[in-house]
């Protein structure tokens, strides 16, 4: 059983059911924390539709929080969500510019995770 993330009928990430559910839940929680829409909408196929511009703004907000916090716990909590979101955003043909001190590491981790995400 899977949890697909789709854009215009194209599957961007055919996540495993539990991985997809957890990611969507974490994104909802982070969006609420950031006071931004996540750009992910549950669909009838048991996954989520991605609205690229809203999702891009969410990822940008998440990255802004991640790159500016000095709180190691908050930084750690946001890390996996951000890397996964960067992969999904790239697949949705959206992008943000990473210019902070974590940029190179995040881009390397994004490339590794993208392969694992299929």
Q: What are these regions, as identified by a protein language model?
A:
Residues 1-118:
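Acidic (Asp/Glu-rich) sequence patches and key acidic residues
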């Amino acid at each position: 059983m899977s949890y697909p993330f789709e854009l215009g009928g194209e599957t961007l990430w055919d996540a495993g059911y539990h991985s997809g559910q957890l990611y969507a839940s974490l994104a909802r929680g982070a969006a609420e924390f950031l006071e931004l829409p996540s750009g992910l909408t549950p669909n009838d196929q048991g996954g989520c539709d991605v609205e690229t511009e809203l999702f891009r703004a969410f990822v940008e907000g998440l990255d802004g929080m991640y790159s500016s916090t000095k709180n190691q716990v908050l930084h750690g909590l946001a890390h996996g969500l951000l890397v996964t979101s960067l992969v999904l955003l790239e697949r949705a043909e959206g992008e943000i510019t990473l210019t902070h001190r974590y940029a190179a590491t995040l881009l390397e981790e994004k490339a590794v995770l993208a392969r694992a995400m299929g």
